């Protein structure tokens, strides 16, 4: 844990230096080390590096010729060696995929597996030392808990954070086919097209 806290502190120090240089502020967003809840600003500083933007290229052939379009969504870094989690519907029709990390680095991504029933997909990029997100359990949430969604709404507003509360838990939602229901978290944090696949954080990160 000490090594992990040190590595996280070093990343936050680099981020703070960039903020100071660009905005001329000395305000600190140091993450609490005593296990207490973070403020929204502290949470953003601690977690935004683990969130990625995903762009897919979709090619269609018809009697009128070949057309190319794009799809966009969000995701989060699962492991330091480049595994990324997103929603299946973000990537399933794409011919090629690009993952963009918070520092602007672009990686070609491969689809490693998908579960269309539960709308989950796993991608892989060739990288090491990536800042992985910390996974939690939805069973630990309570209605009224503050949460934050970080993602790429509308495919253009990368690294956007919105704040809200857990409005409901264990909401049964039917899939588009109607054959399966998925237990969902209900929140009033603003979520738009392009947020799909992105993480929902509690105030402990």
Where are these regions (language model features)?
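Serine-dependent protease modules
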Residues: 1-204
